[in-house]
């Protein structure tokens, strides 16, 4: 299942890339919301191979996910791989400079079920696709 969203941002492409790759900020945000986030790589600078393990409660059930940076192309975009026991996927954020101070960001999320329960959940998502696409 695939979700895509586009947004034009009034900021230079370099600034937008800095914001979408503020990994420490995302870690702090997840921790404030009650998730347990651990960095699982030893890289000193941002790039391909960065990875995290996160555990959090969603809809009353404990969930776990591993996230890995699969592509890192400053300032054009980033690709993340997502792996959990029931779902795998990838998220791609592409940036295009429309002018010196304006950037178009396209985010694509592709999810694939790995278990029967995940297939049933994906079927529910397909039925609610229009509402989810509006929110995405």
Please identify what each model-predicted range represents:
Residues 1-47:
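Hydrophobic ligand-binding cavity/cleft-lining segments
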Residues 2-4, 62-66, 87-92:
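Short, surface-exposed coil-to-beta transition loops
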Residues 9-11, 56-60, 71-73, 95, ...:
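Beta-strand elements of well-folded, non-transmembrane domains
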Residues 12-18, 128, 132-135:
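Short amphipathic alpha-helical segments
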Residues 13, 45, 71-75, 94-104:
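A short, structured loop/turn motif at beta-sheet edges
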Residues 16-20, 26, 52, 69, ...:
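Hydrophobic pocket/interface hotspot
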Residues 38-84:
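Glycine-rich portal/gate segments that line the openings of hydrophobic small-molecule binding cavities
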Residues 79-134:
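Beta-strand/loop substructures that line and gate deep hydrophobic ligand-binding cavities in soluble
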């Amino acid at each position: 299942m695939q979700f895509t969203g586009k947004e034009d941002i009034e900021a230079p492409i370099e600034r937008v890339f800095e914001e979408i790759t503020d990994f420490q900020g995302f870690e702090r945000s997840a921790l404030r919301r009650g998730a347990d986030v651990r960095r699982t790589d030893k890289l000193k600078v941002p790039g391909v191979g960065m990875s995290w393990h996160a555990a959090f409660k969603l809809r009353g059930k404990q969930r776990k996910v591993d996230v890995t940076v699969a592509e890192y192309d400053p300032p054009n975009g980033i690709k993340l791989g997502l792996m959990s026991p029931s779902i795998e996927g990838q998220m791609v954020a592409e940036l295009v400079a429309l002018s010196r101070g304006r950037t178009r960001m396209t985010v694509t999320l592709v999810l694939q079920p790995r278990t029967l329960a995940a297939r049933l959940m994906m079927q529910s998502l397909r039925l609610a696709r229009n509402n989810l696409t509006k929110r995405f």
